[in-house]
């Protein structure tokens, strides 16, 4: 299937799900989800995978159901559809998401396991690799990206208070994101070019994460 844009009811579907996150709503609108959201997302990922997947990772579209086993919010469905090409969480990721808010693209270290966090901080602590990451993130900010993540309020153990990259060392996850509100492009093939351009911009960040962090070697629970 060739990507031709998300369906005309894609945003409307998520507007409705935000208002009524229930199985009856889902069942009544399942055909819309499949045709206007899921199928186009799979087609989008299939067209991007040949450029961004080889030597990096496999791609997948996330399942729509939430894991509510330990969540206070028992809403059964995610209010977005996300897809990713990643080599195990934390070691770099190309991410795209559709929701009622529009389109979002991202990249970087969304989740860092303990061994990945140790390698991340070791790389940041090293002048050559730490300065390289600073330069990458500064360039992304200049081109409209937001740098986000979970960070400690204090310094991590083992590092000096005056470390030149203390702000980076505080991160327990760090990634770049940019968003587009719903517009005509979302429903056109030009949406593919929008995501491709964004992923190319974040490629240096992902390559840094691929080379310096890599996949977790911790046993899977």
Q: What is each residue range found by the language model?
A:
Residues 37, 66-68, 85-89, 100, ...:
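Short, flexible loop/turn elements at secondary-structure junctions
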Residues 81, 92-94, 103-105, 172:
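Generic beta-strand structural signal
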Residues 49-67, 120-123, 127-135:
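Short, intrinsically disordered, low-complexity segments enriched in Ser/Thr and Pro
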């Amino acid at each position: 299937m060739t990507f031709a844009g998300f369906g005309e009811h894609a945003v409307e579907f998520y507007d409705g799900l935000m208002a009524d996150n229930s199985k009856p709503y889902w069942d009544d609108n399942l055909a819309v989800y499949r045709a206007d959201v899921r199928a186009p997302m799979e087609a989008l990922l299939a067209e991007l995978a040949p450029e961004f997947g080889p030597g990096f990772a496999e791609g997948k579209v996330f399942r729509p159901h939430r894991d509510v086993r330990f969540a206070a919010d028992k809403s059964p469905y995610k209010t977005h559809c996300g897809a990713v090409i990643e080599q195990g969480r934390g070691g770099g990721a190309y991410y795209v998401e559709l929701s009622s808010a529009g389109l979002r693209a991202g990249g970087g270290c969304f989740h860092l396991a303990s061994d990945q966090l140790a390698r991340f901080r070791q790389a940041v602590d090293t002048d050559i690799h730490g300065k390289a990451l600073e330069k990458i993130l500064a360039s992304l900010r200049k081109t409209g990206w937001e740098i986000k993540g979970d960070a400690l309020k204090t310094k991590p153990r083992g590092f000096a208070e005056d470390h030149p990259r203390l702000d980076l060392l505080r991160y327990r996850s760090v990634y770049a994101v940019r968003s587009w509100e719903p517009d005509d492009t979302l429903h056109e093939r030009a949406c593919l070019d929008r995501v491709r351009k964004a992923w190319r911009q974040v490629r240096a960040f992902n390559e840094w994460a691929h080379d310096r962090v890599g996949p977790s070697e911790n046993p899977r629970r």
